[in-house]
Regions:
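N-terminal strand-loop element at the rim of the active site
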Residues: 8-14, 27-85
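Short N-terminal targeting/anchoring amphipathic segment
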Residues: 93-101
């Protein structure tokens, strides 16, 4: 069994890159892949007034119904003043272990 992790800020939003990643995760053959999808709700940006789409419960249900293991993490802010768009006050690194993949 191949373990794969998808990791996306605002990953259960209904649109854009998020929806494509959800679809890929949902349609990987579950007899070959164990799929984890790490996501957070939208959070305010530092350095921009842009508002990311928030979690859409229909997308949560869609991915769950296709055998995807959802793992929700917290982010207080996304700092877009830095080239790496740092996640501020996140517990992501407490939940994700790269050695599992």
């Amino acid at each position: 069994m191949i373990k794969v992790a998808f990791i996306k800020f605002g990953g259960m939003a209904n649109g854009g890159t998020e929806k494509y990643l959800q679809t890929i995760a949902a349609h990987l053959p579950k007899d070959e892949f164990e799929v984890d999808f790490f996501y957070c709700d939208a959070a305010p940006y530092i350095g921009s007034d842009f508002k990311h789409l928030d979690t859409d419960e229909s997308r949560v249900e869609y991915t769950k119904s296709h055998g995807v293991n959802l793992i929700k993490f917290d982010v207080e802010f996304k700092d877009v003043t830095k080239p790496t768009h740092d996640w501020i006050n996140t517990n992501f690194f407490d939940l994700f272990d790269e050695d599992n993949y």
